[in-house]
């Protein structure tokens, strides 16, 4: 149950070393082995599962710019929504999801 909690976070901080922000858009392999796509949708970024039991379900929505995004993610198995944080670093997306901002877990997704 908790492994899906971290699917996508609320803040995506991108390392700023004078380079352009790393894109969050694309296909990602989740920690549980499913494939998710993060794509632009209506001025935000939507997270949709492409594989697994909940394939086709939108499980998150992020808004923001300049490498910082806020949003929510839903655990499709429990039908609960969480907030969190994350960071894109090359081909890795480190996610941290929290309940009431105190009970947090993290996981890393890999860009496909």
Residue ranges of each PLM-predicted region?
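Sec/Tat signal peptide C-region and signal peptidase I cleavage site
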Residues: 13-21
């Amino acid at each position: 149950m908790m492994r899906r909690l971290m699917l996508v976070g609320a803040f995506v901080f991108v390392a700023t070393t004078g380079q352009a922000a790393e894109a969050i858009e694309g296909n990602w392999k989740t920690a549980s082995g499913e494939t998710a796509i993060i794509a632009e949708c209506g001025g935000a970024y939507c997270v949709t599962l492409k594989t697994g039991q909940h394939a086709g379900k939108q499980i998150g929505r992020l808004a923001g710019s300049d490498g910082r995004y806020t949003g929510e993610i839903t655990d499709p198995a429990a039908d609960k929504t969480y907030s969190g944080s994350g960071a894109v670093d090359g081909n890795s997306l480190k996610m941290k999801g929290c309940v009431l901002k105190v009970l947090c877990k993290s996981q890393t997704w890999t860009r496909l």
